[in-house]
Amino acid sequence: HIHIDARDLFYKELKGMLLVGKKAEKFIYSMLPPSRETSNWCKKLPMSVESILCIKSDSDFIDLWYDSCEASRSMDKYNEARYHGMNMHARVYLGSVEFRYHSGTNNPIKIKNWMYVCQSITRTGIMLGKALCKDKSALTPFEKRLIDVYTKPYDNEYTYKDFIETLELPLEVSGYVDMRRELFKEHYIVSQSL
């Protein structure tokens, strides 16, 4: 799994990361073996976009995370709240955000590209979290797009183009994601029709 240092991130940035992660999950799972989507070790984020948007403090963030995960608030490493693709229990316990979606590998190409995706989700989430606190007149066009894309309540409004462009994935990484999605396309098409 990938851990990203989050000791200097608080509810605003973590809220942004949850919003980005919530929307990005469908494309993340589509590039991974089907077993990852059904695994108990990297479950989907359990909270809604609407509930994430209601986070107004660090305590709201903690309450939403543990309540949505139906887990107790604890410093125990093996707390049930950790078994999500984006593990925010690690932020409380270790000071990092853990990305658990990807299966284990020692393939350097997979590792490099997956790290880039995780770093991009983190960077985009931080930007979004800060943009949500700004006066609307001070927002850049990109910040406006982030707010528009990641605060819509419905998942079907988030496109693959949004995923690639808002995460600012370079051609090499987006090509890798395309290749992985093609590899698991048959499963993805079937699971979308169920």
Specify the residue positions occupied by each region the protein language model found.
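C-terminal accessory/tail domains of diverse enzymes
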Residues: R7-L194
